[in-house]
Amino acid sequence: MADTTGRIPLWIIGTVAGILVIGLVGIFFYGSYSGLGSSL
């Protein structure tokens, strides 16, 4: 690992971004499947 003090590692940013995207897409599809997509 390189010196990451004071700087966020790119793999952490990628992991968090991936989780957020998957979460948002999952909530969107779950809402549409439950018939709540119109209320969102």
Curated annotation (Swiss-Prot):
Annotated organism of origin: Spinacia oleracea
Name of the protein: Photosystem II reaction center protein J
Principal subcellular localisation of the protein: plastid
Membrane disposition: Single-pass membrane protein
Domain of life where this protein originates: Eukaryota
UniProt entry keywords in alphabetical sequence: Chloroplast, Membrane, Photosynthesis, Photosystem II, Plastid, Reaction center, Thylakoid, Transmembrane, Transmembrane helix
Family the entry assigns: Belongs to the PsbJ family.
Assembly: PSII is composed of 1 copy each of membrane proteins PsbA, PsbB, PsbC, PsbD, PsbE, PsbF, PsbH, PsbI, PsbJ, PsbK, PsbL, PsbM, PsbT, PsbX, PsbY, PsbZ, Psb30/Ycf12, at least 3 peripheral proteins of the oxygen-evolving complex and a large number of cofactors. It forms dimeric complexes.
Cell compartments where the protein resides: Plastid, Chloroplast thylakoid membrane
Gene Ontology process terms (BP): photosynthesis
InterPro entries: PSII_PsbJ, PSII_PsbJ_sf
HAMAP family according to UniProt: PSII_PsbJ (MF_01305)
Function field: One of the components of the core complex of photosystem II (PSII). PSII is a light-driven water:plastoquinone oxidoreductase that uses light energy to abstract electrons from H(2)O, generating O(2) and a proton gradient subsequently used for ATP formation. It consists of a core antenna complex that captures photons, and an electron transfer chain that converts photonic excitation into a charge separation.
TM segment ranges: 8-28
GO CC terms, sorted: chloroplast thylakoid membrane; photosystem II; photosystem II reaction center
